Amino acid sequence: GLLSGLKKVGKHVAKNVAVSLMDSLKCKISGDC
């Protein structure tokens, strides 16, 4: 249903946010932005 669809989308978004956060963190640490 709608709820499981929303959960799936939420997981996808959370994963993308986590990945981009990690990327910007790596960039700040290593200094190659």
From Swiss-Prot:
Function: Antibacterial activity against Gram-positive bacterium S.aureus and Gram-negative bacterium E.coli. No activity against C.albicans.
Keywords, sorted A to Z: Amphibian defense peptide, Antibiotic, Antimicrobial, Disulfide bond, Secreted
One CC-aspect GO term: extracellular region
Disulfide bonds: C27-C33
Tissue spec. comment: Expressed by the skin glands.
InterPro entries for this protein: Antimicrobial_frog_2 (IPR012521)
Alphabetized Pfam families for the sequence: Antimicrobial_2
Protein name: Ranatuerin-1T
Organism placement in taxonomy: Eukaryota, Metazoa, Chordata, Craniata, Vertebrata
UniProt record, GO biological process: defense response to bacterium
Family: Belongs to the frog skin active peptide (FSAP) family. Ranatuerin subfamily.
Subcellular location: Secreted
